[in-house]
Design a protein with these regions (language model features):
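Short, conserved secondary-structure transition motifs
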Residues: 26-36, 208
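Conserved beta-strand -> loop -> alpha-helix junction used to position metal-binding or nucleic-acid-contacting
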Residues: 21-30, 64
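Helix-rich, typically C-terminal accessory recognition domains appended to large enzymatic cores
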Residues: 3-4, 8-20, 85-223
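Conserved phosphate-binding loops in nucleotide/dinucleotide-binding enzymes
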Residues: 34-92, 106-117
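Extended, compositionally biased low-complexity polar/Lys-Gly-rich tracts
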Residues: 24-26, 69-78, 154, 158-163
Length: 223
């Protein structure tokens, strides 16, 4: 979009501005390991099989592969990854959560299937938390415990909202993990199901920009 704005401005000079946006946020690069065969030719991740963190072999020739440093993904070094494969395997929410949680958006990110799998497992725990609360037996409530629980949840909601607005997305995700731990450690306390559900709705709403599919499904069940 910036390119077309510059072109129109240069060719026609009909625009009253040069930049289409008030602020440009430069994002980091997506990086991945590089691989070479014995002849020094680049290999793609689909052409190798990793034996461990330091060893890999060429799937066709079964010969050792040299594992290089993680570099920005490029066609020339053949270290690109098709995100569709990870989306098909773990879901779009898992891939999105991994990307946002790995590092600040202005720094490079190291693409990792293990990292995406970790995000997938965390989302499974959030889903299970919803099921637990929906099926939880009613308990005697303690107003003071509920008040403190509400206060903590509200603090997290406000904090995460500010972090998202300031593009501190990895820190926002870290706080989202903390909110899960707070729910998990409070399930056995004397808090009413109604209180849990109301706060769970707040939790799902701060998850919406990060994992929209899961958050929408959970919100539907909480209606």
């Amino acid at each position: 979009f910036r390119f077309f704005t510059f072109s129109i401005n240069k060719c026609t000079k009909d625009l009253n501005f040069k930049e289409p946006f008030k602020k440009l946020y430069t994002q980091g690069m997506v990086c991945h390991e590089t691989y070479k065969d014995e002849s020094g030719s680049w290999l793609s991740p689909d052409e190798i099989e990793k034996l461990n963190d330091k060893e890999a072999i060429n799937i066709k020739s079964k010969k050792p592969v040299k594992i290089g440093a993680a570099e920005a993904m490029s066609k020339s070094k053949r270290n690109t990854i098709d995100p569709e494969k990870m989306i098909d395997k773990f879901g779009a929410d898992s891939v999105r959560l991994f990307i946002l949680s790995d590092s600040p958006p202005d720094r490079d990110i190291l693409w990792s299937e293990q990292g995406i799998e970790g995000a997938y497992k965390f989302l499974q725990r959030i889903w299970n938390l919803n099921i637990l609360i929906l099926n939880r037996s009613e308990t005697k409530r303690d107003k003071e415990i509920e008040k403190e629980f509400n206060r903590k949840i509200n603090n997290y909601v406000n904090k995460v909202s500010v972090l998202i607005q300031t593009f501190s997305l990895n820190v926002a995700v870290a706080n989202i993990y903390e909110v899960y731990n707070l729910f998990n450690s409070t399930l056995s306390k004397r808090i009413s199901n109604d209180c849990f559900k109301k706060n769970l709705v707040k939790y799902m709403k701060i998850l919406l920009p990060i994992t929209p599919f899961l958050a929408h499904e959970c919100l539907e069940k909480l209606k």
